[in-house]
Amino acid sequence: MLTNPRSDRVRSVHGLGRRPVRERTGRFLVEGPQGVREAVRYAADRVVDLYVTSTAAQRYALDIVQPATAAGLWVHEVSDEVLAAMSDADA
């Protein structure tokens, strides 16, 4: 479980909220269950990592986490604090 909201990985994900970072890396951040569900279902080959809290992992196990795992995606469990730090919201 990722618990350090100041880690390099968390900073990298948070950086995707800025246009220059998205343009440089060619990556973007999808947030919310509907967007993530659709990305896993229809574009799993383009998903790099999936970050979920333990609560979200349980709530969306059947329609997001299990299909992501079956598609060979990296699913990382993170604390609520880490997810907030990754978000584009100023946490």
Predicted regions span which residues?
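N-terminal positively charged helical leader segments and presequences
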Residues: M1-D90
